[in-house]
Amino acid sequence: MGIIRAVNLIFDYIRHDEEHEKEEINHALRGVSLDIEEGSFVAILGHNGSGKSTFAKLMNGILLPSDGTVYIADMKTSDEEHLWDVRKTAGMVFQNPDNQIIGNVVEEDVGFGPENMGVPTEEIWERVDKSLNAVGMTAYRLQSPNKLSGGQKQRVAIAGVMAMKPRCIVLDEPTAMLDPNGRREVIKTIHELNRQEGITVLLITHYMEEVIDADRVVVMDGGQVVMDGTPKEVFSRVSDLKKYRLDVPQVTELAYELKQAGMELSDGILTIEELVDELAEKLS
């Protein structure tokens, strides 16, 4: 059994008119089932409106399914008595770090979550130290978050979630508002947490380059899972990804075009090094 289990999830956004009658129903999720193993790094891809962000919000009880069940460490998110434990187990990081950072000083913000959990003061500071060190933000602990770059703010937001000692972190497009440098530093931080701390990562994104090193890639379209496999397996299906209005990494696209032109290359090339090695072999 995985740390996260989604069983036949259905979620509908319902819009009401002025008389509170149902006016429109948007079927955001249509029978999604996923089992995510503890310690894994899973990326969920999809264009806008695919259902991926709705799925993320169901993972720690921000939203509850219209039908189906979400289990976090065998706890149902729909059981109110378990909701606090669910949110301690599966921490959430959002697109905009400004919506998540509330402290006037970095270290105070990181300690806010553990303090509200009733953690003893001495342990709070131990957690703050460890979390800031893990995301490479110790040198900024006494600074105002307002003076940080977007990437630094997002790392502080991740540290704040880490300080609550979750077993899993759900990141809903955490790099969407960042420049390329900010995106790289945040993704590097997330991978280090996964490898060094053993934290399960569920990354929601539409940036193809961010998922190359994931253990597993899930593609959503129209509220359903349409592809599921390793990065190499998923990116081997370039024409299918284009059908779902998704791009592929630039090097994968180049290899695909060369293959379409008649060159014999492997499917699912993900790095420049892979492509160079194959071309060198073909041309030698």
Set out the residue ranges of the language-model regions.
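Catalytic Walker B motif of ABC-type/P-loop ATPase nucleotide-binding domains
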Residues: 169-172
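The feature captures the beta-strand-to-loop junction immediately N-terminal to the Walker
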Residues: 45-47
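Helix-to-loop junction immediately C-terminal to a conserved catalytic motif
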Residues: 60
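Conserved ABC ATPase signature
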Residues: 144-148, 152
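Conserved ABC transporter NBD signature motif
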Residues: 68-78, 86
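Conserved ABC ATPase "signature" region
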Residues: 122-140
